[in-house]
């Protein structure tokens, strides 16, 4: 495990790639919808049997830490848009007791989603018929600031961590701390 500088200021990794998808309420949501907000991006799918339930339980904890914060949001982007329709995402959101109006479960064009994940965010997603669930992806969360820049801590060697581990308590706690930092910037 890399040791991460607990008090490090957040560095800027780069601009968030542009995206535009449809959320669980059938509204068009783009990166511009989050202008002026601090937000977190993840890639998941509703029928994921392994890491997604852990990721979204942790994301719910993050949501609950910022329930009254109108300048905070979450973009949960499905990598199985053929199955994860607006209706399916709406039901899924209920399962996780999504009450923060800025938590958007997003679906859209398959190729756009895969390009966004693999090239835009450098977060691997892929179809993998041999694995349970049929898709592969990482458990990482990406933090974006009010100006649309990807932000992160640095490790003890001064290298950016870039992503937060959405499967580990430590990663989630760091993310909550860093969201607070950005909201106060």
Stretch-by-stretch model annotation:
Residues 1-20, 185:
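N-terminal targeting signals for export/organelle localization
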Residues 16-17, 39, 138-140:
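Short loop/turn microsegments at loop-to-beta-strand junctions
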Residues 29-59, 74-76:
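Short active-site neighborhood of thiol/selenol oxidoreductases, capturing the structured segment around
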Residues 56-116:
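Structural microenvironment flanking redox-active thiols in thiol-disulfide oxidoreductases
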Residues 103, 114, 121, 125-126, ...:
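Structural micro-motif
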Residues 130-185:
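Thiol-/selenol-based redox modules, centered on thioredoxin-like
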């Amino acid at each position: 495990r890399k040791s991460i500088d607990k008090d490090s200021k957040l560095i800027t990794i780069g601009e968030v790639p542009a995206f535009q998808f449809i959320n669980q309420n059938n509204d068009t949501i783009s990166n511009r919808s989050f202008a002026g907000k601090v937000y977190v991006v993840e890639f998941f799918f509703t029928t994921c049997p392994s890491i997604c339930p852990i990721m979204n339980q942790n994301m719910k904890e993050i949501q609950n830490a910022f329930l009254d914060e109108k300048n905070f949001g979450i973009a949960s982007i499905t990598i199985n848009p053929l199955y994860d329709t607006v209706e399916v995402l709406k039901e899924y959101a209920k399962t996780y007791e999504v009450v923060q109006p800025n938590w958007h479960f997003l679906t859209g064009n398959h190729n756009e989603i895969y390009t966004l994940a693999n090239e835009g965010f450098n977060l691997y997603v892929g179809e993998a018929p041999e694995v349970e669930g049929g898709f592969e992806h990482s458990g990482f969360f990406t933090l974006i600031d009010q100006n649309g820049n990807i932000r992160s801590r640095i490790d003890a060697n001064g290298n950016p961590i870039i992503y937060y581990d959405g499967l580990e308590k430590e990663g989630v706690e760091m993310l909550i701390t860093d969201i607070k930092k950005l909201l106060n910037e």
